[in-house]
Amino acid sequence: MYAVFQSGGKQHRVAEGQIVRLEKLNVETGATIDFNEVLMVAAGDTFKVGAPFVEGGKVVAEVVAHGRGEKVTIVKFRRRKHHRKQAGHRQWFTEVKITGISA
């Protein structure tokens, strides 16, 4: 059984027991979260597709950790002008373990 849900403006395809990195959520580590914006649920050969969300669909997850991703380097460069600007960014994330899927 798997489901597609949305969180943080992104869509994630998950199965039970899977660990997923989401955009940062303001939730304590060890807490349980319910995601109600389920777009699709599939079990074997049967599919439930929402318009836009599956009625009664829910993905339950437990927060495992919070952290920061790999550094992305941004370089702005003007040719022939001896001008260079460099910056970096590390995006915050929340790691969750999927504990239940229901439709």
Curated annotation (Swiss-Prot):
An annotated GO BP: translation
Q: Which molecular-function annotations from GO does this UniProt entry contain? A: rRNA binding; structural constituent of ribosome
SUPFAM superfamilies hit by this protein: L21p-like (SSF141091)
InterPro entries in the record: bL21-like, bL21-like_sf, Ribosomal_bL21, Ribosomal_bL21_CS
- Enumerate the UniProt keywords alphabetically: Ribonucleoprotein, Ribosomal protein, RNA-binding, rRNA-binding
Pfam families xref list: Ribosomal_L21p
Q: Does the keyword Cell membrane apply?
A: no
- Give Gene Ontology CC terms: cytoplasm; ribonucleoprotein complex; ribosome
Record's keyword annotation contains Coiled coil: no
Which HAMAP family does the UniProt entry name for this protein?
A: Ribosomal_bL21 (MF_01363)
NCBIfam families with a match to the protein in the record = L21
* Homology family: Belongs to the bacterial ribosomal protein bL21 family.
- What is the stated purpose of this protein? This protein binds to 23S rRNA in the presence of protein L20.
> Could you tell me what this protein is called?
Large ribosomal subunit protein bL21
Task: Name the species this protein comes from.
Answer: Aeromonas hydrophila subsp. hydrophila (strain ATCC 7966 / DSM 30187 / BCRC 13018 / CCUG 14551 / JCM 1027 / KCTC 2358 / NCIMB 9240 / NCTC 8049)
- Gene this chain is encoded by: rplU
